[in-house]
Amino acid sequence: MDTDVLDVDTARRRIVDLTDAVRAFCTAHDDGLCNVFVPHATAGVAIIETGAGSDEDLVDTLVRLLPRDDRYRHAHGSYGHGADHLLPAFVAPSVTVPVSGGQPLLGTWQSIVLVDLNQDNPRRSVRLSFVEG
């Protein structure tokens, strides 16, 4: 298994498009599976359309589902931080994409994005792993 780790700045963005980095990683391979994993308890990875408002809609929906207030038992960190720890239940910490001829088999409008509503951590690691097959 080949692996690489991306260092991602999330200080000013809640949705970070990882698609170009994933494509670049996959070009060194032929056929197999690429896993994109974020090893953090308050972030996730999704496949969505970006640039047409869907990314903002996702953030708005998550903010409505997980309001930042004092209702959470997990109460350390900034106000409402407990909501951040529930995010991975809604947006999984990984996605796996089939790869053929070194290209991720994404649909025309699909992008791989890091989702991070937690403003306490301005940097995130994203692990890319490739399994030949």
From Swiss-Prot:
InterPro entries: UPF0047_YjbQ-like (IPR001602), YjbQ-like_sf (IPR035917). Gene3D superfamilies: YjbQ-like. SUPFAM superfamilies: YjbQ-like. GO terms for cellular component: peptidoglycan-based cell wall. PROSITE patterns: UPF0047. PANTHER family: UNCHARACTERIZED PROTEIN YJBQ-RELATED, UPF0047 PROTEIN C4A8.02C. Belongs to the UPF0047 family. NCBIfam families: TIGR00149_YjbQ. This is UPF0047 protein Rv2556c. It comes from Mycobacterium tuberculosis (strain ATCC 25618 / H37Rv). The lineage of its organism: Bacteria, Bacillati, Actinomycetota, Actinomycetes, Mycobacteriales.
